[in-house]
Amino acid sequence: MRHYEIIFLVHPDQSEQVGGMVERYTKLIEEDGGKIHRLEDWGRRQLAYAINNVHKAHYVLINVECSGKALSELEDNFRYNDAVIRNLVIRRDEAITGQSEMLKAEENRSERRERRERPEHGGHEGLDGDSDKADE
């Protein structure tokens, strides 16, 4: 069996169906003796260019080890599912199990956003209060 990295984009109006689609696709691979090494739901993202007048899509990344038969069946599912607007299958030399760069960047962004929104109580307030007392 070979290793593949699969990314597919789902129409934003069908985002609520992504969970069922992922479940169906992983079941297809596992029933054929394949293995899921990594599964990441990147959520809705802006497209670099419009596809059929759609400017956003729901991204899903799956790293699998599967047979050619399972892969061709998966590609057929992508082709005949109107909700999947694009897909990309890349053959890899080995299984990739770590977090993707895309997910790491998203986590870093959310951490920075949380730090920015969370008020700091580290001593900035004390300095302002002391200067007010000194003026009296």
UniProtKB/Swiss-Prot annotation:
Xref: InterPro entries: Ribosomal_bS6, Ribosomal_bS6_CS, Ribosomal_bS6_sf, Ribosomal_S6_plastid/chlpt, Transl_elong_EF1B/ribsomal_bS6
Swiss-Prot/TrEMBL keywords: Ribonucleoprotein, Ribosomal protein, RNA-binding, rRNA-binding
Superkingdom, natural source: Bacteria
Composition bias type Basic and acidic residues, residue spans: 103-136
Presence of the UniProt keyword rRNA-binding in the record: yes
Region (Disordered): 99-136
Keyword ATP-binding belongs to the record: no
Gene Ontology MF terms: small ribosomal subunit rRNA binding; structural constituent of ribosome
Pfam families the record matches: Ribosomal_S6
One GO CC annotation: cytosolic small ribosomal subunit
Function (record text): Binds together with bS18 to 16S ribosomal RNA.
Family: Belongs to the bacterial ribosomal protein bS6 family.
Entries under PANTHER family matching the protein: MITOCHONDRIAL 28S RIBOSOMAL PROTEIN S6 (PTHR21011), SMALL RIBOSOMAL SUBUNIT PROTEIN BS6M (PTHR21011:SF1)
HAMAP family: Ribosomal_bS6
Name under which the protein is recorded: Small ribosomal subunit protein bS6
Species assigned in the record: Azotobacter vinelandii (strain DJ / ATCC BAA-1303)
Gene: rpsF
